[in-house]
Amino acid sequence: MSAEEQDTRSGGIQVIARAAELLRVLQAHPGGLSQAEIGERVGMARSTVSRILNALEDEGLVASRGARGPYRLGPEITRMATTVRLGVVTEMHPFLTELSRELDETVDLSILDGDRADVVDQVVPPQRLRAVSAVGESFPLYCCANGKALLAALPPERQARALPSRLAPLTANTITDRAALRDELNRIRVDGVAYDREEQTEGICAVGAVLRGVSVELVAVSVPVPAQRFYGREAELAGALLAWVSKVDAWFNGTEDRK
């Protein structure tokens, strides 16, 4: 490769990196930003920001209401995200089924969506008494196992944006003190497993954990269990979930035999 070709390739990579940076800034500000506000946040010249935004808008990756914005993520991003979610559900479903059969409990697959955890797939066991939500339901991050697992995996800045100004109690057990929640998230980062001890719904508990390398989106799996079966089984459920997560992560990262 000639020096000229190398320079061209390097310049192309730099443009892609800058475009990705702009998209991440807009993802963090769903209400939209002006060109000037975007430029301030990414530290680029206004002419560079304008050129990249125009190219992204032509591709439907950003959208604006006028020549100077505000700019938001465009419809093509939504279509891509939908495709990614469908792919994750398809690939993950056999693994969810395996875990549900092992524990004889419901297993939920959730994806981070702003300040909530969206349930995108679920496997339900034949148990007569079982904990069941529904695919399509959405829960606040701070009071459910899958949500807290997702929160704990976020960098501090994104974590702060994903929390409401007030941690409203959904039950008597909901953590409503920010310092206490921060301590809980620190523990989750160390242990790898999150607990919901009747914090989101009375009578329902859960363990949850994040899966890494499965999707470009942040994904969590939780095992909701009726409270009367949960207490006394916490260590068993957490251990089984962590072993399963390790196996699934290894499979998706290509370090486990796929035969």
Curated annotation (Swiss-Prot):
BP terms from Gene Ontology: negative regulation of DNA-templated transcription
Signal peptide bounds: none
Keywords noted in UniProt: DNA-binding, Transcription, Transcription regulation
SMART domains according to UniProt: HTH_CRP, HTH_ICLR
Annotated TM spans: none
Pfam families: HTH_IclR, IclR_C
Keyword Transcription on entry: yes
Domain IclR-ED: 88-259
HTH iclR-type domain boundaries: 13-75
DNA-binding region: 35-54
SUPFAM superfamilies: GAF domain-like, Winged helix' DNA-binding domain
InterPro entries registered for this protein in UniProt: Cro/C1-type_HTH, GAF-like_dom_sf, HTH_CRP, HTH_MetabolicPath_Reg, Tscrpt_reg_IclR_C, Tscrpt_reg_IclR_N, WH-like_DNA-bd_sf, WH_DNA-bd_sf
CDD domains: HTH_CRP (cd00092)
Entry keyword Transcription regulation: yes
GO molecular function list: DNA binding; DNA-binding transcription factor activity
PROSITE patterns: HTH_ICLR, ICLR_ED
Function of the protein: Binds to the upstream region of Rv1714 and probably modulates the expression of the downstream gene(s).
Quaternary structure note: Homodimer.
Name the record gives this protein: HTH-type transcriptional regulator Rv1719
Native source species: Mycobacterium tuberculosis (strain ATCC 25618 / H37Rv)
Lineage, uppermost ranks: Bacteria, Bacillati, Actinomycetota, Actinomycetes, Mycobacteriales
